[in-house]
UniProtKB/Swiss-Prot annotation:
Inhibits viral infection of plants, and protein synthesis in vitro. It catalyses: Endohydrolysis of the N-glycosidic bond at one specific adenosine on the 28S rRNA. PANTHER family: PTHR33453, RIBOSOME-INACTIVATING PROTEIN. It comes from Mirabilis jalapa (Garden four-o'clock). This is Antiviral protein MAP. GO terms for molecular function: rRNA N-glycosylase activity; toxin activity. Keywords: Antiviral defense, Disulfide bond, Hydrolase, Plant defense, Protein synthesis inhibitor, Signal, Toxin.
Length: 278
């Protein structure tokens, strides 16, 4: 026969289990590392910010003398901070395995708030931003694909990249009611100036170090952004070589992603910051 104490603990355990099922956000989220922070008032630190990101996600070994994203992480998810001031900071939710941005957090009405792309599952979202709870955890109506972002925020070529542009996009959304167009514009800038810049030296080198300067996203940049996997695969599939600087030779040459034509691994290395994990 169950004692009163045993009955109590049985009921308590049952309630805790039920509560965790119907309130998944109540489960403790892991403590995630902030792998890099960018102070938008100090734009000269931008390239070191990008270098820090590459260092955090890079494998210990290289492929054809090119850094590559690691296959394994102690923690797969992390944060990256974009700082406007002591009272305005956007924190990006990052998947370390590919540097995908999954969402962001800010403060609204003195409470933590988080937005996630439409295609981010609840199981993944629950790893991030434990300070944002209940109705302050919001699923966006669009995904993180460039197709969705450009549909809602304008074409990449019409959204120049620059430190002030990024700062202004944060000011436009921080603590304010969700606005699809403004949020999509923010993501277009943040994804290209953080994730794509870490993936491609060509892009990171294009971002001006002066706060009020900007660069138009041209067809060379979008071609790289749309073909990271293709270029990475070409490097992984290359053959050993004793005559090239990278010790590698493309198995199939050239690799064409219009308007780019890459005839050697060395040419790919010139634009690449990180290879996609194999």
């Amino acid at each position: 026969m169950l004692t009163t104490t045993k009955v109590f603990f049985l009921l308590l355990t049952t309630w805790i289990t039920w509560y965790a099922i119907v309130n998944p956000q109540s489960r403790a989220a892991p403590t995630l590392e902030t792998i890099a922070s960018l102070d938008l008032n100090n734009p000269t630190t931008y390239l070191s910010f990008i270098t820090n990101i590459r260092t955090k996600v890079a494998d210990k070994t290289e492929q054809c003398t090119i850094q590559k994203i690691s296959k394994t992480f102690t923690q797969r998810y992390s944060y990256i901070d974009l700082i406007v001031s002591s009272t305005q900071k956007i924190t990006l939710a990052i998947d370390m395995a590919d540097l995908y941005v999954l969402g962001y957090s800010d403060i609204a009405n003195n409470k933590g708030r988080a937005f996630f792309f439409k295609d981010v599952t609840e199981a993944v979202a629950n790893n991030f931003f434990p300070g944002a709870t209940g109705t302050n955890r919001i699923k966006l109506t669009f995904t993180g694909s460039y197709g969705d972002l450009e549909k809602n925020g304008g074409l990449r070529k019409d959204n120049p990249l620059g430190i002030f542009r990024l700062e202004n996009s944060i000011v436009n959304i921080y603590g304010k009611a969700g606005d699809v167009k403004k949020q999509a514009k923010f993501f277009l800038l943040a994804i290209q100036m953080v994730s794509e810049a870490a993936r491609f030296k060509y892009i990171s080198d294009k971002i001006p170090s002066e706060k009020y300067e900007e660069v138009t996203v041209d067809e060379y940049m979008t071609a790289l952004e749309n073909n990271w996997a293709k270029l990475s695969t070409a490097v992984y599939n290359s053959k050993p070589s004793t005559t090239t600087a990278t010790k590698c030779q493309l198995a199939t040459s050239p690799v064409t992603i219009s308007p780019w034509i890459f005839k050697t691994v060395e040419e790919i290395k010139l634009v690449m910051g990180l290879l996609k994990s194999s």
